[in-house]
Amino acid sequence: MKYLFYNIEYSGIDLSGNRYTLFSKEAFTDKDKPELVNMKFVEANFYFKDDTILNVISKEGVYNNKTLDMEFKKDVIAKYGESKLVADKANYSNSNSFLEISENVVVTDQKGTVHADKLLFDIKKQNLNIISLNNNKINAKINLK
């Protein structure tokens, strides 16, 4: 049995002490796995301690209301400062304090554009790893001005 909801909002603080909000126009849960909230037309905002904001939108997503983990799927768009990211998938792991972006990743900002297979952002350490799979190259156009 499935339970259908409209215009839902979750908010909280992750294990690193950062605040977040999560919105969905439509969502459903399954009786057998009530902790998993399957969502459509998703928007999340992460408010970091340094006063920066990460905004993520996607056509679909899954929120685990026990672990606070989030998965974003289909037409993922993220904005962080002057940077814009597009990808097919993004996973936020609250328990491991990281954000993994994968599949057709393109990051664009004032300094240039990067195409990669996967990005791993460690929230606690505030560092980014850019990964290429299957011996693919990471394509980057960087403006050094």
Predicted regions and their residues:
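Mature-chain termini and adjacent capping regions
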Residues: 1-145
